Amino acid sequence: TGDMSGEGKGMWFGPRL
């Protein structure tokens, strides 16, 4: 996913975009 984890920096809005 990467919604709040920052793993999918591009899927949602990762904190570490």
UniProtKB/Swiss-Prot annotation:
Keywords: Amidation, Neuropeptide, Secreted. Signal peptide: none annotated. It is found in: Secreted. One of its GO terms (molecular function) is neuropeptide hormone activity. GO terms for cellular component: extracellular region. The keyword Secreted applies. The modification Leucine amide is found at residue 17. One of its GO terms (biological process) is neuropeptide signaling pathway. InterPro entries: Pyrokinin_CS. Expressed in abdominal perisympathetic organs and abdominal ganglia. Belongs to the pyrokinin family. Myoactive. This is Pyrokinin-5. It comes from Derocalymma versicolor. The lineage of its organism: Eukaryota, Metazoa, Ecdysozoa, Arthropoda, Hexapoda.
